[in-house]
UniProtKB/Swiss-Prot annotation:
Enzyme Commission number: 7.1.1.2
Protein name (database record): NADH-ubiquinone oxidoreductase chain 6
Annotated transmembrane regions: 1-21, 25-45, 46-66, 75-95, 108-128
Enzyme class: translocase
Localization per record: Mitochondrion membrane
Main localization, broad class: mitochondrion
Reaction catalysis annotation: a ubiquinone + NADH + 5 H(+)(in) = a ubiquinol + NAD(+) + 4 H(+)(out)
Organism: Caenorhabditis briggsae
Family the entry assigns: Belongs to the complex I subunit 6 family.
Listed result of changing residue 98 to K: In strain: JU725
GO CC, alphabetical: mitochondrial membrane
Keywords: Electron transport, Membrane, Mitochondrion, NAD, Respiratory chain, Translocase, Transmembrane, Transmembrane helix, Transport, Ubiquinone
Role noted for this protein: Core subunit of the mitochondrial membrane respiratory chain NADH dehydrogenase (Complex I) that is believed to belong to the minimal assembly required for catalysis. Complex I functions in the transfer of electrons from NADH to the respiratory chain. The immediate electron acceptor for the enzyme is believed to be ubiquinone.
Length: 144
């Protein structure tokens, strides 16, 4: 079941990267977060999944506020989507860990959540790459 949630999270993040409309892209990025939450909450600290969810959603809504008034979007076809999907499923697939080795504070920050941190960082980088690559910034940001 965890693998299913993981594959759905990766799939929705790739669809978020492929989608041209920023509103739909943010919607699929939120789906990616929701599908990755069961994986995060299966670990030792359940409160940490809520913390990640709040930070991620606040970032997504800030991005939506700035990019909702778009006036022009460039359409560019990307053929790397299937390759990115395959590589992310292979590289970031969840594995079972022994929690007795990770009871220290350094294990909490580095060892257990390394793949989760990197997965969320990759999703946000995909979304920011999408935003900076497809937009002309004619009405995206505030004028100075």
């Amino acid at each position: 079941m965890i693998k299913l949630f993981f594959v759905l999270a990766i799939f929705s993040s790739i669809i978020s990267y492929m989608n041209i409309d920023p509103m739909k892209s943010s919607f699929f990025l939120i789906f990616s977060l929701l599908f990755s939450m069961p994986i995060i909450s299966m670990s030792m600290h359940i409160w940490f999944s809520y913390f990640i969810c709040l930070l991620f959603l606040s970032g997504i809504f800030v991005i939506l506020v700035y990019f909702s008034s778009l006036s022009k979007i460039n359409v560019v076809k990307s053929y790397m989507s299937l390759f990115l999907l395959l590589i992310s499923i292979i590289y970031f697939s969840p594995v079972s860990m022994e929690y007795t080795n990770y009871l220290g504070l350094s294990g909490f920050y580095y060892s257990i959540y390394w793949f989760i941190f990197s997965f969320i960082l990759i999703c946000l980088l995909f979304f920011m790459n999408f935003s900076s690559y497809f937009l002309n910034f004619s009405g995206a940001l505030r004028k100075v």
